[in-house]
Amino acid sequence: MEMKIDALAGTLESSDVMVRIGPAAQPGIQLEIDSIVKQQFGAAIEQVVRETLAQLGVKQANVVVDDKGALECVLRARVQAAALRAAQQSQLQWSQL
């Protein structure tokens, strides 16, 4: 899946996460994480983001995660929504999700 535009999903409210995804100039996933629980869960957040993007077939993107203590299911949903918006996909492939 190719990222065509910058897109975001989520809010900065407590127990939520804002995910921004856009096209990258370099190959790979460039990931920046800012989280109130980064010391405890930073590695888990990175793993969930990278797994979710891999499931969607994203190989090249700039990703910024601003986490306010979101649950894993919320993080996954926000990453999926932002990636689909950035790829400008209007038809969902439910089997990928």
Curated annotation (Swiss-Prot):
<comment type="function">
    <text>Covalent carrier of the coenzyme of citrate lyase.</text>
</comment>
<comment type="subunit">
    <text>Oligomer with a subunit composition of (alpha,beta,gamma)6.</text>
</comment>
<dbReference type="GO" id="GO:0005737">
    <property type="term" value="C:cytoplasm"/>
</dbReference>
<dbReference type="InterPro" id="IPR006495">
    <property type="entry name" value="CitD"/>
</dbReference>
<comment type="similarity">
    <text>Belongs to the CitD family.</text>
</comment>
<dbReference type="Pfam" id="PF06857">
    <property type="entry name" value="ACP"/>
</dbReference>
<keyword id="KW-0597">Phosphoprotein</keyword>
<dbReference type="InterPro" id="IPR023439">
    <property type="entry name" value="Mal_deCO2ase/Cit_lyase_ACP"/>
</dbReference>
<protein>
    <recommendedName>
        <fullName>Citrate lyase acyl carrier protein</fullName>
    </recommendedName>
</protein>
<feature type="modified residue" description="O-(phosphoribosyl dephospho-coenzyme A)serine">
    <location>
        <position position="14"/>
    </location>
</feature>
<keyword id="KW-0963">Cytoplasm</keyword>
